[in-house]
């Protein structure tokens, strides 16, 4: 495995970094979203009594008598906090194959340089550049595909959280407005 990494050339390092950062973000967000969604399943009474961290600013605004628009702005701010980091996953899923493609180009340049500087070309002389081209392309795609899937999954979960938060916010506002 290390031999393949080395044959991929210097661009394997940024591809590996993309993989590490992407997987770390996915794991972090998955745990965060799981906890938030677990709290979001609480009833309105439980939310008021337990006050999940994500709902705290909304509950505080409701108790202060903020209007529906103000509560909506606070809710949007909370959703943005939840979504923080998702754009990095999108970026990683986009640039990993581009880095791989750059490795394809540099590998093919190396192969053509061998052809240019040799009077007779032996296929094994071209192998290094071709190895680099193929390995970096594959590595870029192997990083991008699961990161893209993780990004899509987490975006859906963030949308679910935002929906539940809006629903609870509306219910809290209506309850407070009606004096319940």
PLM region descriptions:
Residues 3, 115-117, 123-127:
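Membrane-interfacial hairpin junctions
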Residues 3-42:
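Transmembrane alpha-helix/interfacial motif
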Residues 9, 23, 59, 100, ...:
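Residue-level signature of catalytic and energy-coupling elements of molecular machines
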Residues 12-25, 90-97, 143-147:
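Alpha-helical transmembrane segments of integral membrane proteins
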Residues 31, 35-121, 147-180:
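Predominantly long cytosolic amphipathic alpha-helical stalk/bundle segments
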Residues 87-92, 124-137:
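Cytoplasmic-entry segments and transmembrane alpha-helices of multi-pass inner-membrane transporters
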Residues 131-149:
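Hydrophobic alpha-helical transmembrane segments of polytopic membrane proteins
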